[in-house]
Amino acid sequence: MSINTLAHVFTPHGNIVYTANDFRQTVRIAVAGTIALSISTFYDVQYGVFFVVYPLMLMSLVPVFNRHVARQFVFSAAVNCVEMVLIVGYLSQWPVIMTLVVFALYVMRFRFMSQGPLFLLGSMGVVCQSTMLNFMSYPTSNWHTLMFSNMEACVLAVALSALLHYLIPDVEPRKPPPRIEKDAARIRHESLLSGTVATIIFVVFQICDLSDLLSALMAGILILFPMHYRGAVISSIWRVAGVVLACLYILVVQLIIYDFSNHMILMMPLIGLGLAFSARLHVMEKVGAGVGFASITTIGIMFGQNLHPYQDLVFSDLYRITSVTVSLVVTLTLVFLMHRLLNCFAATRFVVSD
């Protein structure tokens, strides 16, 4: 479906549903990402990736705004800050205990996602937990700056979402997504599978010096969002396509204004155009974390990390594409093995029917 949608993005798409509400969501995503990136660049914040990715995630995954959404988003970030201080500050001297606590938190959050009503709380918690554990594990990281940046970015995301939903409201009320009925065995399967694989990713990033592979880390975590093997396979294909699209666009932008990339007035319109294209693809797909969402988050991560005009751009893009591909292959292998293992037991059995 996403490949067909990708082809229709460049052509008349009479057989693709793109409503007035979809157009407004596209505009909200592009404007929010551009504003967030402008703020993080203007103030030269150390963890600009938070300021860019959080608004993009919130408005891409949740097309509405209300108090329930705001509470879940802010509460998740606040709880994560407290958890990270306790885990890294007090448990880092006991690696086994630390890993078990991280595993328990991942399982709890994926269980929230699997059950449905607290999906945003769980998904935001998974992303926060993964990125903050990665950043805080390196001695050069300033914990206070990291935690304040995380909370400030969260508040900024909620404020931008509220403002843009007020200024660019939907034309008609949106229908809530259909509720998926899941039995207890399926919920256990999804939460244990995703939690175990996420914990293994955490251990690998702790053992190896992978501080510059945030894109690869997020790729491995985000394809776990379907929380079952078949969904992870499809999600990984979408992820690779989205990352390649975004990297090619970023390369073109950097080549066009190579010596002037520090001029916001030149960069921001092109970044906004890339976000608008990716957001349009995302809302046309209507599959959640598809090609468009992968492209949106890749643009946010790469520009949020402040790409510099004098680095090797071709190597930078190829490095990210290669690292993401390797991360996805390894993650899919782990998902497959866990899927087979959990299906050996009736209490955690989950067979996807055709």
Feature locations, PLM:
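Conserved catalytic neighborhood of penicillin-recognizing serine enzymes
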Residues: 131
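Alpha-helical transmembrane segments and their membrane-interface boundaries
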Residues: 1-121, 135-271, 277-354
